[in-house]
Amino acid sequence: MAIILGIDPGSRVTGYGVIRQVGRQLSYLGSGCIRTKVDDLPSRLKLIYAGVTEIITQFQPDYFAIEQVFMAKNADSALKLGQARGVAIVAATNQSLPVFEYAARQVKQTVVGIGSAEKSQVQHMVRTLLKLPANPQADAADALAIAITHCHISQNVAQVSETRLNLARGRLR
């Protein structure tokens, strides 16, 4: 069993999603958004750090998965996103959580099957995979999708490692 915290970073809205993985079964534990209503960036970063720390304390995750920074058209926005992402990662590492990073395209490919999927498609698939009564908010859905991606990728890595080990031992032909 593992609890995974997914984070969709943003300087104004940071989505989070928490799921539990038992074998191949995924279950929803919680999700939401950290909203920073103050104007100055240092105060927003402080709120993101405090919010992520509080979520970690509440859910006690085993793994922390976060979206990688993509290059936006606006360099200033990309820098702010990188800073928001950085404080979230610091909150995780301060709690000794292992951090895993996934590209947005990889998350969409894993959850929807199309790397260029729309936000509404991600929301629908997250709702379906986690058996939720309604679509989660867009930022929370993205965070849940990041957590789901971590589960799928870590399972695949474990299976490949086991197969390689069995091949090395001569158990598979």
From Swiss-Prot:
Q: Which residues bind Mg(2+) 2?
A: 67
Q: Which family is it part of? A: Belongs to the RuvC family.
This protein is called what? Answer: Crossover junction endodeoxyribonuclease RuvC
Q: Point out the gene that encodes the protein.
A: ruvC
Question: What is its biological role?
Answer: The RuvA-RuvB-RuvC complex processes Holliday junction (HJ) DNA during genetic recombination and DNA repair. Endonuclease that resolves HJ intermediates. Cleaves cruciform DNA by making single-stranded nicks across the HJ at symmetrical positions within the homologous arms, yielding a 5'-phosphate and a 3'-hydroxyl group; requires a central core of homology in the junction. The consensus cleavage sequence is 5'-(A/T)TT(C/G)-3'. Cleavage occurs on the 3'-side of the TT dinucleotide at the point of strand exchange.
Q: What InterPro entries would the database entry show?
A: RNaseH-like_sf, RNaseH_sf, X-over_junc_endoDNase_Mg_BS, X-over_junc_endoDNase_RuvC
One cellular component GO annotation, for this chain's record?
A: Holliday junction resolvase complex
Q: What organism does this protein naturally occur in?
A: Klebsiella pneumoniae (strain 342)
Reaction equations catalysed: Endonucleolytic cleavage at a junction such as a reciprocal single-stranded crossover between two homologous DNA duplexes (Holliday junction)
